[in-house]
Amino acid sequence: TETRPKLLREAAVGNIAHDPNGHGYQPYVGIPELRKGFAAWYQRWYGVDLNPNTEIQPLIGSKEGILHVTLAFVNPGEQVLVPNPGYPTYTSLSKILGAEVINYDLKEEDGWMPDFETLENMDLGRVKLMWTNYPNMPTGANATPELYERLVDFARRKNLVIVNDNPYSFILNEKPISILSVPGAKECCIEFNSMSKSHNMPGWRIGMLASNPEFVQWILKVKSNIDSGMFRAMQLAAATALEAEADWYDGNNRNYRNRRHLAGEIMKALGCTYDEKQVGMFLWGK
């Protein structure tokens, strides 16, 4: 079954064949068409207004953003809060760059949400970043508006930056939400997104981050010393793919539901239990 937007393939072929500027260096900030595409996508699906010129930074996949953000915000010896369980790269890159990792536990009895009472009682004087990831890898827990409101309030009061990794919000999820929908969140939050997950195109390496203009400029200062931009044809094709209609996402999720059902049957055959309300691309059981 075709699991990528048809218009992505058509746009890619056309752009590679006919764009005479496609073989040169591209802007560090990404081409305007892609930035505008991400801005329109965020407005349409998350209800979040982003300035495409100052509040969006395309990435060569959102994974590289973990490196860029850590370099921009954390000095060696400073601390970062990392969820446990969680994406291993938050921990490994922090350690490589000399930061101290402080785990905060996500527990089943709390719905795999942060325990704010425990966090409030921690010494956070050296903490610069707090990594969050919803829909969560690997537990499948989904975010709520209330969770995002609490995280923004926590970041403001504790003078730290929340980095919300949000690549799975279109997978088996009725209503994608963004932490940036919380009023004032841009002041203290950065959000990642990834077309690897939302549009099934991991080999294209197209992601993005969004935040306030000052944070974006700090990150761009790091990024511009690491790479020299993405292939123009891929950026143009990605901008076109961001125009996919709801029926494409619905069809994609039908495929995921079929796969989730098969995975669930395997789990049951093994005597495992799991929460059927999980969203995203993981099935977490025991």
Predicted regions and their residues:
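Conserved PLP-anchoring active-site segment centered on the Schiff-base-forming lysine
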Residues: 72-94
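Conserved glycine-rich beta-strand-loop-beta hairpin in the small C-terminal domain of fold type I
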Residues: 239, 256-267, 274-286
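Active-site phosphate-binding strand-loop segment of PLP-dependent enzymes
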Residues: 102, 106-177
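Structural signature of PLP-dependent enzymes
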Residues: 219-226, 241-265
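N-terminal small-domain helix-loop-helix segment of the aminotransferase-like
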Residues: 1-61, 68, 242-244
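A short helix->loop->beta-strand "cap" motif at the edges of active sites that frequently abuts
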Residues: 78, 99, 157-161, 185-187
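Active-site PLP attachment segment
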Residues: 182-218, 230
